C-alpha cells in the first residue's frame, strides 16, 4: 500500500467519517482508492476534511499531493487554510499578503476525484500533469484556483469564486490558469455542465502557457464572471494560439457581447464531440473501468 495512504489514514483517524485506502485491480492495473464513508446520512462532503496551512512556495504548500497514476478519491474535503481568515480586521492587523497556498496537487495520470471539496484562495487545485476526471466536486478560490498543465474534465462541478474575508484585497480573480505549451500538447481543462458562482468577480481564465486551452460546455455562469471573460496575462501576442471557448453556456455571466475579440467561436456539435469525456481523456476507457462500490 502506498505510504501516502498510510499517512492520510493516520491523519484522519480522529476525524468524523472513516477513511478507506484500497488497492483494487482493474485489468492488469492496480487502482489505488481512497474512500471516506460519511458518518450518518445527509451530512455532505465536508464531514471528513484534511487541512494544512502551507504557503512557503507553490510546490511545497499543498495539503494533499498525489504522485502515482491510477488514483481514485471519493467523498473527501481538502483545504489549505492559509488565506482563509475569519475577519478582514485580522488581515489588516497582520498586513496580510495573499500567497499561493495549494489544497491539492495532482501529478499522476488517470486520476479521478468524485464528490470531493477543494478549498483555498490562490492556487487551490494544481492540476499538474496527466489525465484527470473531477466529478460532482466543489472548488473554491479566487486567484488561479484551478491551474497547471493537466488534461482534465470537470464534470458537474460547482466553482465558487470567493476571497472570503480578504475580498477587499482581490479586485478580480481568475478561475483557471492553464499551461498548454504547444499545439501538439494534449492538455487542457474542460468544464462540462456544472456552475460558476460566488462573490468575487472573476475571469474564466488567464494564460499560463502560449497555447493555453480551457473550454466551458453547457455551464451555468453567474454574474460574477467578468464581461471580458479571458485574459492573456504574460502571453500577449499569443492570443490566436489560445483555445478559449464557451459552448451553450447559460446564466447572467454567459453574455458574450463584451468578451475579448480573440475568444474562439467553436462549432457546438463538433466541440462537444471533440472534448467529450470519452474522446478527450477516456479513449482507453480507464474511467469506464474504475471499480464502483
UniProtKB/Swiss-Prot annotation:
Keyword vocabulary terms for this entry: Aspartyl esterase, Cell wall, Cell wall biogenesis/degradation, Glycoprotein, Hydrolase, Secreted, Signal
One CC-aspect GO term: extracellular region
This enzyme's EC code(s): 3.1.1.11
Active site: 123 (proton donor), 144 (nucleophile)
Keyword Glycoprotein in annotation: yes
Entry binding sites for substrate: 81, 206
Family: Belongs to the pectinesterase family.
Name recorded for this polypeptide: Putative pectinesterase 52
Source lineage: Eukaryota, Viridiplantae, Streptophyta, Embryophyta, Tracheophyta
Amino acid at each position: 500500500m502506498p505510504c501516502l495512504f498510510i499517512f492520510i489514514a493516520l491523519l484522519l483517524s480522529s476525524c468524523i467519517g472513516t477513511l478507506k485506502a484500497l488497492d483494487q485491480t482493474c485489468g492488469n492495473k492496480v487502482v489505488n482508492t481512497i474512500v471516506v464513508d460519511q458518518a450518518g446520512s445527509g451530512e455532505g462532503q465536508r464531514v471528513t476534511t484534511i487541512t494544512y496551512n502551507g504557503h512557503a512556495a507553490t510546490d511545497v504548500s499543498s495539503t494533499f499531493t498525489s504522485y502515482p497514476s491510477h488514483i481514485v478519491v471519493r467523498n473527501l474535503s481538502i483545504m489549505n487554510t492559509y488565506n482563509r481568515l475569519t475577519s478582514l480586521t485580522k488581515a489588516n492587523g497582520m498586513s496580510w499578503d495573499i500567497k499561493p497556498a495549494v489544497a491539492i496537487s495532482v501529478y499522476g495520470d488517470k486520476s479521478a476525484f468524485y464528490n470531493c471539496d477543494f478549498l483555498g484562495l490562490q492556487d487551490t487545485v494544481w492540476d499538474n500533469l496527466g489525465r484527470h476526471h473531477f466529478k460532482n466536486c466543489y472548488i473554491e478560490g479566487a486567484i488561479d484556483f484551478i491551474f497547471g498543465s493537466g488534461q482534465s474534465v470537470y464534470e458537474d462541478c460547482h466553482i465558487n469564486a470567493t476571497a472570503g474575508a480578504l475580498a477587499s484585497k482581490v479586485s478580480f480573480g481568475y478561475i483557471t490558469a492553464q499551461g498548454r505549451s504547444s499545439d501538439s500538447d494534449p492538455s487542457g481543462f474542460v468544464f462540462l455542465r456544472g456552475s460558476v458562482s460566488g462573490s468575487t468577480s472573476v475571469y474564466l481564465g488567464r494564460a499560463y502557457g502560449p497555447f493555453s486551452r480551457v473550454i466551458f460546455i453547457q455551464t451555468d455562469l453567474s454574474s460574477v464572471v467578468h464581461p471580458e471573460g479571458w485574459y492573456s496575462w504574460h502571453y500577449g501576442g499569443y492570443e490566436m494560439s489560445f483555445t478559449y471557448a464557451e459552448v451553450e453556456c447559460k446564466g447572467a455571466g454567459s453574455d458574450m457581447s463584451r468578451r475579448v475579440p480573440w475568444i474562439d467561436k467553436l462549432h457546438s456539435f463538433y466541440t462537444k464531440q471533440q472534448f467529450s469525456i470519452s474522446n478527450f481523456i477516456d479513449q482507453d476507457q480507464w474511467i469506464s473501468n474504475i471499480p464502483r462500490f
